[in-house]
Amino acid sequence: MEKIAIVTDSLSDIPEDLIKTYGIFVVPLTINIDGKSYKDGVDIKKEEFYKLLREGKMPTTTQASPVEFMEVFEDLLKSFDYVIAIILTSKFSGTYQSAVIARDMVDKNRIEVIDSRHFTLGNGMLVLKAARMAVEGASKEEIVSTVYETIPRIRGIMVFDSLDYLYRGGRLSRTQSIIGGILNVKPILTNEDGELKVIDKVRGQKKAIRWIIDYMKNTGIDFAEREVGLIHTDKEEFLNEIEAALRSELEITRFIRSQAGCGIGTHAGPDAAGVFFEEK
């Protein structure tokens, strides 16, 4: 049986217990605050980060470097036959390109680098699928093929309080960001081929939850048999309300719940929540 290591970046926001359970290797991005740099999920705790964010600090992110990936790849190839790295969308960060450079410098034949075209738990769910397959003994080719087949089937819905963080980070135009400043209006965003797009806006959290439920019902999926990802930045009460509605109206019982790390929090702000799932 092939020994396969699964690698991702810190913006996949996989819960720590699942990272340990499946032996996933995470390469952190760098968070910059007031002239100091921190490794996402390593040098700064989420609680401390979101406290700073609510105090008005405006952090930035720096992609993981080729050298950081090289060190991880070289170390893993000492004990694994292959490495599969599933990285957040290349349209959001240069981290994917860093991983590609590292692959080319270490061993192109034993390292596969995949542009997930997703972010946060959209990417995380792909990583978890790959990691579970690796544990079950699937081959490198089987895992890579399944991940590529799954990429277009992952759907994500994010509800933001403000789009200012995305605008300041260069991930959204000024025109798109304006609607987030209207009192109690919740912008709803989704992923379109690796980019965040504002697709609607509603007034208040209850209508945002209703929008999510209606969207998911319209897919025609029997969610009672599906695993659904739930993510929040620093808005757990809102996420609890979303989960309760999903359990009640769609009979969902299997969830991956996570708090977004500093990387996603930098661009989403402290008051965002989202739902991720795989279509048919």
UniProtKB/Swiss-Prot annotation:
Residues 4-279 form the DegV domain. Hexadecanoate binds at residues 61, 93. InterPro entries: DegV, DegV_C, DegV_domain_contain. Transmembrane segments: none annotated. Pfam families: DegV (PF02645). It comes from Caldanaerobacter subterraneus subsp. tengcongensis (strain DSM 15242 / JCM 11007 / NBRC 100824 / MB4) (Thermoanaerobacter tengcongensis). It comes from the Bacteria. One of its GO terms (molecular function) is lipid binding. Gene3D superfamilies: 3.30.1180.10, 3.40.50.10170. May bind long-chain fatty acids, such as palmitate, and may play a role in lipid transport or fatty acid metabolism. Keywords: Lipid-binding. This is DegV domain-containing protein TTE1491.
